């Protein structure tokens, strides 16, 4: 469907029309979700070039495309390519939209996750702490994005061996998600697995066994919904 839409928009509107660029972004997103990363990256790179040329490097749609390309690079393990794009996007978003704009908070979270993937834990923790503080202040302590930020900070603490701090945050997040989302919501299950992994890392095996479901380790999360409309998919 996305391929047909892009073909039609390109034929009818031309390759540089905003609707064509939006269709190309959506096809790239679908490729990324399907694990077809090389195809996704090629489309995102083309879109970034076109949007930069047509809209300018600081237009919100250009920032979204740069963020999306960085995410595809990250998924492909190309952290050296992803991190500079995330850094540039955060800088531009902060300057254009403001420090506390939701898209700026998303950009900061994404950069923190990339730093964490690259083993730059001090940098990741600094950004995660700032993002959690801002989300708590702006959205409240129980907003889903705040809970995601708390989960991600706990994950970074855990990677850094700061297990007591990680466990405290994981316990708080699990309690809040169970109360707000219900015990069987996917994010609640993620929190339960992450807390179990932290317990196990701390040698608290009995506590872990009470919670544990198979998991490859503490999972970080994208800010907001799985595919935040403001960051990934154009309408």
Residue ranges and their predicted role:
Residues 1-235:
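Intrinsic-disorder-linked linear interaction elements in eukaryotic regulatory proteins
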């Amino acid at each position: 469907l996305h391929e047909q839409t892009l073909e039609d928009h390109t034929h009818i509107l031309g390759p540089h029309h905003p609707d064509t660029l939006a269709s190309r972004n959506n096809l790239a997103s679908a490729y990324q979700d399907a694990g077809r990363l090389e195809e996704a990256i090629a489309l995102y790179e083309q879109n970034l070039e076109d949007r930069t040329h047509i809209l300018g490097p600081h237009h919100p749609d250009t920032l979204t495309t740069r963020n999306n390309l960085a995410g595809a690079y990250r998924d492909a393990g190309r952290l050296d390519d992803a991190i500079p794009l995330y850094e540039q996007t955060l800088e531009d978003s902060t300057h254009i939209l403001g420090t506390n704009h939701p898209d700026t908070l998303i950009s900061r979270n994404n950069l923190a996750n990339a730093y964490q993937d690259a083993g730059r834990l001090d940098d990741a923790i600094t950004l995660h702490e700032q993002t959690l503080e801002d989300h708590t202040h702006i959205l409240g302590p129980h907003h889903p994005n705040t809970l995601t930020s708390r989960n991600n900070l706990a994950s970074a603490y855990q990677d850094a061996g700061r297990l007591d701090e990680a466990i405290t945050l994981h316990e708080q997040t699990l309690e809040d998600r169970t109360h707000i989302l219900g015990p069987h919501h996917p994010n609640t299950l993620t929190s339960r697995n992450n807390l179990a992994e932290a317990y196990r890392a701390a040698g608290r095996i009995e506590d872990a066994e009470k919670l544990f479901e198979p998991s490859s380790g503490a999972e970080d999360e994208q800010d907001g919904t799985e595919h935040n409309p403001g960051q990934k998919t154009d309408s």
